[in-house]
């Protein structure tokens, strides 16, 4: 989708160089269409990297998308310049009276903390409650998915004996689901987390379909029966070197971290990783935008309930 973003956003130059269709504000205003309004609540510390990864995935198809970047007001970012946040981001208070076709809630490196210990938890709960009636479909990623499952359905997360870290094969659990349209029977996705949600807890709820899982990485993609909420426990948005950067960061901190599985050729960290998840990452986001947002959301967002 051609994405409408500010002309000076750092992601614009990166995506333009990759031939992703980025539309400037002037051109967008002269197209006689209603763009999809997609908000991204960016909880990741490396906000510029994350916004670029997500914009890459929701760009370059025929529907115009207008992006609103959000960050939690109750958290001070240590890794993103305040100038960037002031220029390109809004807080929930600034958009709470608006409605959106879609919302993406990213992951965050806080999954080893109890939800209630996260300093922006109360604000996040308000945003998740607001999303039920002010957003047509919400796409939750990794810790964002765990947070939503816990808040909306009381589904707990459990600590893992060691970090789930690497690229893992997945299977389709529910065939003929539009969210997975075009997916291969076996496909790959990155995971990077210290906790998990369990199938038996999800199945007890009765309102959530498990669409995909992995023998090693566990439950991967879920959605509510109407598709208004999507939960993804991995990081399909990650680019080629994200896991490498996380691995090197943890090594530099002196943490006990194993090499990401199925990532470096021959398990040799000097060799560049081969990306085998990009196609399905693009399918996942384009299917969500097409079948669960564009084809379902009301033309007049004021009719959203």
Curated annotation (Swiss-Prot):
GO process annotations (BP): L-methionine biosynthetic process from homoserine via O-succinyl-L-homoserine and cystathionine
Record-linked SUPFAM superfamilies: Class I glutamine amidotransferase-like (SSF52317)
Biological or metabolic pathway of the protein: Amino-acid biosynthesis; L-methionine biosynthesis via de novo pathway; O-acetyl-L-homoserine from L-homoserine: step 1/1
Leader peptide range in chain numbering: none
GO terms for MF: homoserine O-acetyltransferase activity; homoserine O-succinyltransferase activity
Positions of the record's site feature: Important for acyl-CoA specificity: 111
Site, Important for substrate specificity: residue positions: 192
Protein name: Homoserine O-acetyltransferase
């Amino acid at each position: 989708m051609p994405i409408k973003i500010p002309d000076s956003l750092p992601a614009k130059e990166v995506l333009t160089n990759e031939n992703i269709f980025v539309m400037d504000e002037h051109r967008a205003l002269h197209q006689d269409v209603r763009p999809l309004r997609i908000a991204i609540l960016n909880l990741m510390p490396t906000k510029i990297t994350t916004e670029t990864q997500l914009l890459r995935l929701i760009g370059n198809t025929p529907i115009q998308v207008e992006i609103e970047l959000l960050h939690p007001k109750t958290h001070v970012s240590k890794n993103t310049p305040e100038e960037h946040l002031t220029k390109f981001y809004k807080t929930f208070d600034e958009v709470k009276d608006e409605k959106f076709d879609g919302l993406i809630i990213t992951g965050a490196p806080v999954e080893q903390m109890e939800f209630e210990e996260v300093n922006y938890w109360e604000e996040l709960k308000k945003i998740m409650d607001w999303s039920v009636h002010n957003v047509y479909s919400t796409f939750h990623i990794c810790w964002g998915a765990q947070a939503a499952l816990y808040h909306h359905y009381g589904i707990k997360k459990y600590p893992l004996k060691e970090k789930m870290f690497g690229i893992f094969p997945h299977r389709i659990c529910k065939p003929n689901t539009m969210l997975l349209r075009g997916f291969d029977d076996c496909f790959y996705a990155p995971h990077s987390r210290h906790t998990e949600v369990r199938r038996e807890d999800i199945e007890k709820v009765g309102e959530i379909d498990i669409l995909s899982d992995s023998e090693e990485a566990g439950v991967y993609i879920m959605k509510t029966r109407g598709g208004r909420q999507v939960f993804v426990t991995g990081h399909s948005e990650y680019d080629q070197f994200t896991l490498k950067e996380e691995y090197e960061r943890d090594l530099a901190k002196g943490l006990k971290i194993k090499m990401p599985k199925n990532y470096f050729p021959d398990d040799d960290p000097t060799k560049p990783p081969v990306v085998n998840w990009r196609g399905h990452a693009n399918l996942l986001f384009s299917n969500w935008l097409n079948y669960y947002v564009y084809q379902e959301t009301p033309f007049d967002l004021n009719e959203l309930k």
